[in-house]
């Protein structure tokens, strides 16, 4: 069985704070575990592309996206009690949201049997108009 792995080193640029539980080491641990398990021969690696606005706006209204762009331009900040943007967070979030689309395309093209997106920040808690639970965008909804 072949596995399409969609990931990118730029996900490590999302830093929510030194003591924040959603930290770069989480992704590093996943990738180290894959390597330690000797799974490299089963992997088809792909890099994500930042999600296109047309795909992003199917889930998130322009005003919500603009507020994230503005905060990114200001260098980041706290969005809610759990969710923080740092200087590399907005690009990482757009890449994470685009990763699911790359995975779907790869599966449709027959590049692999299954896909795994090793991304950060995560993207399963955000609502269309709110960040939540470490998530800036809802990657799952974008991919759907």
For each of these PLM feature ranges, what is it?
Residues 1-144:
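HDAC/HDAC-like amidohydrolase catalytic core signature
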